[in-house]
């Protein structure tokens, strides 16, 4: 039995799935990546993949950077950069990296703390501070409010 004959289709299907997710989610995020008040670096230079693979906030390096949706994303390793390049929408924070709890209140709060994060249902949510992250996770309906408010906030951000 040729094991490579079985592995190649699996690798290709994961790659294609990543491409499809990026194509579908990319337009929804286009132009809406929070880079703070100055510069063009997403998540204040933190590695978006590390939240998923290491379960912690890890500062990325300019050495491993990638441009996506008008922002520069930093990574802590070449592997994390590659993972992101294959499926960026799988790792990018929800609501363009704006404070998720703020979005629940109808506000696009640009100042986030990369240490104040949650992964809920396989998605990354960044917040202004640890209290906001806790509120997003623990208050019933908070995430649903954010989901409902995000389309209107996107329109306002696009109009700026």
Language model segments and positions:
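Generic low-complexity segments that are intrinsically disordered, proline-rich and/or Lys/Arg-biased
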Residues: 7-10, 28, 152
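Bacterial N-terminal signal peptides that target proteins for export
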Residues: 2-19
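Charged, low-complexity intrinsically disordered segments
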Residues: 30-160
């Amino acid at each position: 039995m040729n094991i490579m004959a079985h592995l190649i289709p699996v690798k290709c299907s994961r790659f294609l799935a990543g491409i499809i997710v990026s194509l579908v989610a990319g337009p929804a995020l286009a132009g809406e990546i929070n880079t703070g008040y100055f510069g063009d670096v997403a998540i204040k230079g933190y590695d978006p993949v590390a939240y998923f693979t290491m379960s912690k906030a890890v500062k990325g390096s300019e050495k491993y950077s990638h441009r996506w949706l008008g922002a520069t994303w930093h990574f802590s390793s070449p592997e994390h950069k590659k993972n992101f390049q294959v499926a960026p929408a799988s790792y990018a924070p929800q609501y363009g990296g704006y404070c998720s709890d703020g979005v629940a209140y109808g506000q696009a709060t640009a100042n986030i703390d990369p240490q104040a994060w949650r992964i809920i249902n396989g998605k990354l949510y960044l917040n202004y501070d640890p209290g906001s992250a806790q509120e997003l996770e623990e208050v019933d309906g908070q995430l649903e409010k954010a989901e409902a408010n995000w389309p209107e906030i996107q329109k306002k951000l696009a109009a700026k």
